């Protein structure tokens, strides 16, 4: 019997190298029956089996060492994966909380926004976009520019400021056309619209001769127009009372115009109504006036102003073509007590908003 002594030293997990510690080589000397403590154990096996056992032990030690080295190498990658996963999870949680808060705040804002505010913001945005479109078209005039300016006139005629005087305009056209055929009503409406266009053209000529366009007069003209709108709104709301001088109180324009033809009366009425509605068309109109003042071309300037005023008065012409519908609107005269307060509220709100926007522009608040 041959005694083969094997001693296996365990592999340390803290070593920086991954070399397996192999068992002691099989001793080829004579068999020994003693064993020293800590060096191994006596295995009484035949010589043939001793060789096979040592090979199996070596193979097992190598596999164990390779497994431990693989674990050591993969530990940093595992830790990095866990760290990245934690960061992604935390970011997703924060994004969810932020999204919920934004949805909650937007839902609250939409809930607080009334239909009137939404409609007013829509009309205001449409007016600003129309003004920007006109400015873009003035850089290179074409037939498309005329269509854009005509559309800008339509948008301006639907502004809240213009709508505040729309009941008066419709009431005048309806009352003026009572008892007359449609052709005469349409003719008077055209004369009324020409009166509006004349006032706007006079403003353009005055601005051209003075050499002061909307963008060159600073804050004076918009602030003055806004202040006038606020005063007129307070007057319609009966907060303040405006009295004309005695000369105007003794003068009755209706009696003076009674002997004039109906078309002339409509034309004069258009001149008066345009004075009330001209501050409402300030953005687009002033852009056109500025271009006319700088281009010094009366033909081009007159064509642009005519196109704009045509779009501005187009809703009135369309309304005038439905004389029967206008007459049916007169049946609601019992509700006319609400016209002045509503018109005053429109004028007051538009005047205050424009005044604050001119005095404290939003661009100056941007850091």
Swiss-Prot record:
Family membership noted in the UniProt record: Belongs to the DsbD family.
Residues spanning the signal sequence: none
Job description of the protein: Probably involved in the transfer of reducing equivalents from stroma to thylakoid lumen and required for the biogenesis of the plastid cytochrome b6f complex.
Domain of life: Eukaryota
Residues spanning the membrane: 76-96, 102-122, 148-170, 190-210, 220-240, 273-293, 299-319, 336-356
Record key words, sorted: Chloroplast, Cytochrome c-type biogenesis, Electron transport, Membrane, Plastid, Thylakoid, Transit peptide, Transmembrane, Transmembrane helix, Transport
Lineage of source species: Eukaryota, Viridiplantae, Streptophyta, Embryophyta, Tracheophyta
Provenance organism: Oryza sativa subsp. japonica (Rice)
Pfam families: DsbD_TM (PF02683)
Name used for this protein in its record: Cytochrome c-type biogenesis ccda-like chloroplastic protein 1
Low complexity biased stretches: 26-45
Example GO biological process: cytochrome complex assembly
Subcellular location: Plastid, Chloroplast thylakoid membrane
Membrane topology according to the record: Multi-pass membrane protein
